[in-house]
Amino acid sequence: MENGKHPLVGVLAIQGDYAAHARALIDSGAEPVMIRTAEELVGLDGLIIPGGESTTMLRFLERDGFLGELKKFVETKPAFGTCAGCILLAKEVLHPAQPSLSVLDAAVERNAYGRQIDSTILSAETSLPGGPLEMVFIRAPRMTKVGDDVEVLADREGFPVLVRQGHLMAATFHPELSADRRVHQLFVDIVKRNLNGRRSSQPVEEAVYTELDVRTQ
């Protein structure tokens, strides 16, 4: 938190609508930083890995040791992956298989909901305060399995679409394309609590959701 006020949250600016993520972070009380090299990870308090094409993103990250440094970062600091970012965080990637950062205890099936023309916007219930959550799906992956310590915050047709595991969050949809800032706000709250030394092994959820509840009233 070099600016002394807002946490510094990186946005991996390789593919996807990273500018929309940056706007959502500003609205949620964080300072966004566009990241394209491993060196730029230094000093960040958290990181968002946006959507895009996961194999293309992976090839970019494999240059100059970026992938290794990114893995070290997400193992210890808050990270939020959306769509392709969710694939990169997952421990198991299916149809077809591919390497990943392997930190989120989940199995993810790529492009499970069909082609981009079949993408959709829907509203679904969530455990976050404030009522149903708008979800924008674009060539979305599907989480087919999550570990016991992964909290499902929202689902679609019985499959998780928004999850949290300690300092990690993942979504198979694009919250940055919605005016609803609750998802980004939750991540920023996790980043802030991590900075304050309240580790993810503690019961963070209740306090974070209470803060969200106050803001949605």
Region spans (language model):
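N-terminal beta1-alpha1 cap of cysteine-dependent amidohydrolase-like domains
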Residues: 1-64, 69-72, 181-185, 189-217
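Solvent-exposed alpha-helices and their adjacent loops that cap or buttress functional pockets
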Residues: 2-5, 39-42, 72, 80, ...
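A generic structural signal for alpha->beta connector loops
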Residues: 6, 29, 76, 98-100, ...
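Cofactor-binding loop segments of dinucleotide-utilizing enzymes, especially the Rossmann-like FAD-
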Residues: 14, 84, 173
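Hydrophobic anchor at the start of a short beta-strand
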Residues: 32-33, 79, 168
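Redox-cofactor binding/interface segments in oxidoreductases and associated redox assembly factors
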Residues: 49, 81, 171
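Cysteine-nucleophile active-site neighborhood
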Residues: 54-125
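Amide-donor transfer/coupling interface in amidating biosynthetic enzymes
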Residues: 110-217
